[in-house]
Amino acid sequence: FDAATPSGNGAAALLGLWLGRYYGRNDWELQAEEVAGQVADHLLRAVAGFGTILQVIEFLAAPGRELVIIGPPERRVAFEDAAATRFLPWTAIAPTADADGLPMFEGREPSGDAALAYVCENMMCLMPARTPEELVALLG
């Protein structure tokens, strides 16, 4: 049951969703879905008491969207600022200097000294944006 503080189940499910997006772990997303299913009957009787679980359900219904901004930190700033002009509630945003560490970085190499931005859905990416203006156009 949620109130001003998220429930343990809700917080764990929401964290599992975010980490699942970052690490490409569908099993974590399935566990979050299972948690939401476990409280579905209670949720229908007391919607106001399950705010975090409602966030989980909305997140599960949203397309899996990722934004990878790759390049030297000083070159990424313009892309990060461009992304900040858009409402991206269920988008995992991952800035990085190199393509190491997370599955969403695989195959997305920096372009020399320049930054690139990849807009992806379920880890499938469009061609990279080479300018902040291109990124804004891709984000819609």
Predicted regions and their residues:
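Glycan-recognition and catalytic cores of secretory/periplasmic carbohydrate-active enzymes
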Residues: 1-140
